[in-house]
Amino acid sequence: MPDSPIRSDALKEYRKLYEEGGPFAQLASLFQVNLILDANVIIKELIWATTKRKNPLGRSDLLEVLEVETVVAWAPTFLEREVEKNFAVVVGKGARREDVVDHWVHLRALINFVDVGGVPADVKYRDPKDVPYILLQRRIEATIVTADKDVAAMDGKVVPLAVFATLRAYSRAAAVQVTLQVSGYTLGSLGLRALVQITRFASSGVKKAMTNVPREVWLAMLVQHPLNRLNK
């Protein structure tokens, strides 16, 4: 099946149309989820982008969902130090340091950083480096994306890195849908028919029920999506 000419970036362009108060707000909503990124997520991304990427314009699952704003990324300020401390590890994989720094600067601009303080000295933890992520989770109630088993062992709510593949698949499919929806609305009679169908759906009990489902439940459903299981 050929790739659609409609890129997932259309989501970012049209997202405001579907936000509360926007002209399409009553017709549908675009899924968006807050996720906390662990340092191992960023380090893996840096290694891929600087040593394995063949197409300079190619994007990883992570980068795409960040750029199209399907994922709103969060991290404790501690992550910055942890990532920069591991630049040498990435360079050791064959990357040029300047490429690592450039990609990190781009990624950092897509992450919301929160200072949650340091690790309490009077408490013992399985892995003290994971504490800032758990503290941030308690503050903003977002799931942590990590490959570190210690986070879950310390009662952190986690999801595997494979979730980004599922979220990218959603983003691409949703981009096609909203592009056709918006374009159809502006194309006269064809758009009017589509708009009527969407409006009927929006006013149905099904639509009302869907909008009441917490986003954490949607995330759990995405994690169980067949596309996600194929990437494990």
State where each predicted segment sits.
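A short acidic (Asp/Glu
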Residues: 45-48, 83-89, 155-157
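Active-site neighborhoods of divalent-metal-dependent phosphate/nucleic-acid chemistry enzymes
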Residues: 111-143
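Acidic, PIN/NYN-like endoribonuclease modules and their adjacent C-terminal/linker elements
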Residues: 150-232
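PIN-domain endoribonuclease scaffold, especially VapC-family toxins
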Residues: 67-70, 77-119
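Short, well-structured N-terminal submotif of metal-dependent ribonuclease cores
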Residues: 2-73
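Active-site flanking residues adjacent to catalytic metal/cofactor-binding acidic residues
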Residues: 37, 147-148
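Short hydrophobic alpha-helical runs that function as membrane-insertion/retention elements
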Residues: 72, 142-147
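Alpha-helix capping/helix-boundary segments
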Residues: 41-42, 79, 133, 150-151
